[in-house]
Structures are given as C-alpha cells and as structure tokens.
C-alpha cells in the first residue's frame, strides 16, 4: 500500500465533523456545495487513476456519505459515463435526498440492492457508510460490502472504506477492500492506524 499524501496531523471523526459544521454554519457554505466539491474530487481522482470506466457502479447508503456518491453519479453522467447507483436505503438524510435529486436530474439509473446482483465490468464506488460508522454493521450493508469485495473490480472508497472505524482503524466484521480512498477535510486516524492501511489502498486528500 502507498499513500499519495502523508499528513502531519490525524483527526478524529468528531474533529472532522466539527470542521464540517464550522464550514456550514460559520462560513455559511451550504452542505450540498460541500458535497459537490467532494464528489468532484472523487470523480477527478478516479478518472486520473483508472481512466474512464465502461460502467461506474456506485453503492449508496442513507447518510451524507451516500450524498457524495449521488453527486459522483450526476457528475459522471454529465461526462457521458454509463453510471448506475445501487441503493441500500430509501430513508435518506435531507442532504442525501437533495443529492439524489441532483442525480435524478442527470438521468442516473437507480437500482435497488439485491444480494444476487452481478457487476462484471467497470469500477465500483463505495459510498455506503461514512465516518459515523462505529462497528455495528447492519444488513444488507454486510452483504453489499462482501459483494463489492468479491467483484474483482477496481474499488474506490468515498472518504473512508465502509466497515472501517474512522478513529481506530478497526474492522469489526467486514470492510471494503479499496484500491483508492479519496478523503476530505482532514486525514482520519483510522485510515492510517490499526487495520486501516490494509483496506484503504492509495489515500488522496
């Protein structure tokens, strides 16, 4: 594993959330704007690393990490990349719902998750679980992570591989085995400690 960027400081998930709050409340940067910045970063790094995929499959959960994934989908569609979003939840956070609407306006294809789903080409983006994951992996998230890992395709994690604890780097059950992790705001402790380095692949901030 290699790191494209070595950080002088590592941040806890709580610290990163506080920096995010400051950006939104004190600097008055709308959350959706931050999501669009994050999504643009993910797509840029993905294309620079792997080139345009024949198919981009983005797995989305329910929170703001999913929102980033919906933005990636919309931006990819705007570049005429074939893209599908695999959805694990219809109960989205407010910001994730806004991001989904943005993807829908870009005519992104939404596919409900099914454990029998087969993805045989392209690149997979993991936008299931963010830094709020603390080690209690609900289904069908475990099934989705296993399906992602078993695909044999290049895997890109949004902010942090799903299933990895952002503070400790601990994997309680299963985590996405990413080839590339594009993280935001600050380098999370768990990316560089514990089992984190074995699951993150190259890390871009």
Report each predicted region and the residues it spans.
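Positively charged, low-complexity intrinsically disordered leader regions
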Residues: 1-52
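YjeF_N-associated NAD(P)HX repair module
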Residues: 2-15, 121-205
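Conserved active-site and cofactor/substrate-binding residues in soluble primary-metabolism enzymes
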Residues: 11-14, 29-41, 67, 94, ...
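Residue-level detector of flexible, active-site-proximal loop/helix-junction positions
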Residues: 23, 90, 115-117, 162, ...
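Unusually extended, aromatic-enriched hydrophobic runs near protein termini
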Residues: 25-26, 81-84, 202
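Nucleotide and nucleotide-moiety/phosphate-recognizing core
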Residues: 43-128, 136-158
């Amino acid at each position: 594993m290699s790191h494209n960027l070595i950080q002088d400081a590592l941040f806890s998930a709580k610290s990163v959330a506080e920096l995010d709050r400051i950006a939104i409340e004190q600097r008055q940067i709308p959350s959706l704007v931050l999501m669009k910045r994050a999504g643009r970063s993910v797509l840029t790094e993905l294309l620079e690393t792997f080139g345009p995929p024949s198919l981009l499959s983005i797995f989305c959960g329910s929170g703001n990490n999913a929102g980033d994934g919906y933005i990636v989908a919309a931006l990819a569609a705007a570049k005429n990349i074939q893209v599908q979003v695999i959805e694990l939840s219809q109960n989205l956070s407010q910001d994730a719902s806004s991001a989904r609407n943005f993807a829908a306006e870009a005519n992104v294809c939404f596919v409900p998750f099914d454990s029998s789903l087969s993805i045989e080409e392209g690149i997979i983006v993991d936008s299931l679980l963010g830094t709020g994951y603390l080690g209690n992996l609900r289904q069908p998230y475990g099934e989705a992570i296993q399906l992602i890992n078993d695909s044999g395709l290049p895997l890109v994690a949004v902010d942090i591989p799903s299933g990895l604890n952002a503070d400790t780097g601990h994997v309680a059950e299963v985590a996405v085995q990413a080839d590339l992790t594009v993280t935001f705001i600050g380098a999370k402790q768990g990316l560089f400690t514990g089992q984190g380095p074995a699951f993150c692949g190259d890390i871009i901030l």
